[in-house]
Amino acid sequence: QIDNVEPHERHLFDRWFNRWFLGAVDGFVYMSEQVHRELECYTNAPALFSPHPRFDSYGEPVDRTEACRRLGLDPQRRYALFFGLIREYKGLDWLLEAWAKLRAEGRIGSEWRLIVAGECYTDPEPYRRRIVQSGLEEEVTFHDRFIPDERVKDYFSAAEFLVLPYKSATQSGVTQIAYQFRLPVIVTRV
C-alpha cells in the first residue's frame, strides 16, 4: 500500500528515485485519488484503490471535563485542535495567522482557545515566535512533543473540532482519528 508517491519535503533525486523504484513494482494499492494521479506519472502498473483505514486503537471518547483536567485545560473554555506531526506543509503558520486575524476582528469569542499538539518535524521556535508576536500566548496551548497513544483520546475529547489547514495533502491519518472520535473537521481545499 502506497501512502505518498511524492515526499512532502522535496529532495534533489526524488523524481529519479521514484521513476527507478516505482517502475520495478508489479502493482499498487493507493489510498487517495491524488496518490493515484501521482503514481500514473511514473508507471502503468495495475493499481487498486483502498481508502485510508480508520483508526480505532485510541479508545473511546472520554468525558470532556475529565479530558480537559488531564491536559491541564480549563473546561469552561472551548477548544479547536491542530493535531499530529507538525510539518511545514500542514499549515500551522496559516492557522496561527488566521486565528490572530479573526481574534483582532472580533470573529472568535473570548471563550475559544487553540490546542496545538504534536512533535515538530523541524525547529518549533518559528511557531513559538509567531504565537508571541501575534499576542496569542494566552490563547494557544502548544504541546510540542510526541503524543503517546493513550493520551490521544484526551485531545480529541477536549476539542470541539479539528483544524487541518494543510497546504498540500494526499490523505490524512489525523482525519481518521477525528472520525473515530466523531469530531468535526475543518480543512483547506487542497
Regions found by a protein language model. Give the residues of each.
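Glycosyltransferase donor-sugar binding loop
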Residues: 54, 83, 113-126, 145
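Donor nucleotide-sugar binding/catalytic pocket of nucleotide-sugar-dependent glycosyltransferases
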Residues: 23-64
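A short, histidine- and acid-enriched strand-loop-helix "catalytic/donor-clamping" loop
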Residues: 1-12, 27
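Nucleotide-activated donor-binding/catalytic signature segment of Leloir-type glycosyltransferases, i.e.
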Residues: 125-146, 150-153
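Conserved donor-binding/catalytic core segment of Leloir-type glycosyltransferases
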Residues: 74-90, 96-99, 114-115
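Nucleotide-sugar donor-binding and catalytic loop/hinge architecture
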Residues: 62-79, 106-109
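Acidic donor-binding loop of glycosyltransferase active sites
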Residues: 154-172, 180-183
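Short donor-sugar binding/catalytic loops of nucleotide-sugar-dependent glycosyltransferases
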Residues: 83-88, 102, 119-121, 146, ...
